[in-house]
Regions:
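Conserved thiamine diphosphate
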Residues: 138-188, 212-215
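Short basic, glycine-rich beta-strand/loop surfaces that mediate nucleic-acid
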Residues: 117, 171, 198-200
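Short flexible/disordered coil segments
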Residues: 104-111, 134-140, 158-164, 186-193, ...
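Electropositive phosphate-/nucleotide-binding environments in soluble metabolic enzymes
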Residues: 20-23, 27, 34, 45, ...
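Aromatic-enriched
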Residues: 2-17, 194-206
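Conformationally flexible catalytic loops at phosphate/diphosphate-handling active centers
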Residues: 67-71, 182-258
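Thiamine diphosphate
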Residues: 8-147, 152, 169, 188-189
């Protein structure tokens, strides 16, 4: 049996086997993220609201993810609450996602440190938007995502709708296998609301690419009375430093995973 070449693999998965649809960037992000999501912690904010809205609609319609389940959507009182929901849900062993932008993303930063520090795989999808200063501005820039650079989240950026579909999947797959959370972002309005004809992912193909052993390993580390474990402890500076340094091997390995 002749092994499939990389070109043949690319041609089979990326060109021949995929259907084409017309959609905007938010819809593309919602489509690909729904596949990997068991719980979505949401709170609407322009211009990312359509992502959460689509996920909510598909959940209500009974759409299944790659695990054969319908996504549980939890709308909180603010983005801070949504991020707390993501953290708690991940700690309980559920693949969890959220969608936000601008000041909403800034409210999530405290929980982002916790999620990254505990090596919990997840993806925050962000339609990057100006952080309001002397006035409100709902249009795109990267002032929100730049504020998150030292949280420990890896960052993936897209420049068009097709990239949102493809690299959005990469963010989820790499987070699962690499145990590092991702902030996946694209320009608010310029990409989030840009309409293009793109090749979409079939959920069966995404399931085939998912490292299910890594998913099961993630679930084994969840909070469970059958497997007692300590979380949220207090550490002095010497031990705290050692534990922070212990994360480095996952970040060093991540480029190869991506």
């Amino acid at each position: 049996m002749i092994l499939e070449t990389k070109f043949e693999y690319f041609r089979r998965y990326f060109i021949l086997a995929r259907k084409f649809k017309t959609m905007d960037g938010n819809t593309a992000a919602a489509h690909v993220s729904y596949a990997f999501t068991e719980v979505a912690g949401i709170y609407p904010i322009t211009p990312s609201s359509p992502m959460a809205d689509y996920v909510d609609q598909w959940s209500a319609a009974g759409r299944k993810n790659i695990f054969g389940d319908t996504v549980k959507v939890v709308e909180m009182q603010s983005e801070a609450g949504a991020a707390g929901t993501v953290h708690g849900s991940l700690a309980a062993g559920a693949m969890t996602t959220t969608y936000t932008a601008s000041q909403g993303l800034l409210l999530m930063i405290p929980n982002m440190y916790k999620i990254a520090g505990e090596l919990l795989p997840c993806v925050f999808h962000v339609s990057a938007r100006t952080v309001s200063a002397q006035a409100l501005n709902i249009f795109g820039d990267h002032s929100d995502v730049y504020a998150c650079r030292q949280t420990g989240f890896a960052m993936m950026c897209e420049t068009n709708v097709q990239e949102v579909m493809d690299l959005g999947a990469v963010a989820h797959l790499a987070s699962i296998e690499g145990r590092v959370p991702f902030l996946n972002f694209f320009d608010g309005f310029r990409t989030s609301h840009e309409i293009q004809k793109i090749a979409i992912w079939d959920y069966e193909d995404l399931k085939e690419m998912t490292n299910m052993e890594a998913v099961e390993e993630f679930r084994k580390h969840s909070l469970n009375p059958e497997r007692p474990a300590m979380r949220g402890s207090h550490e002095n500076d010497d031990i705290f430093f050692q534990h922070r340094e212990a994360c480095n091997k996952y970040y060093n390995a991540l480029p190869a995973v991506v």
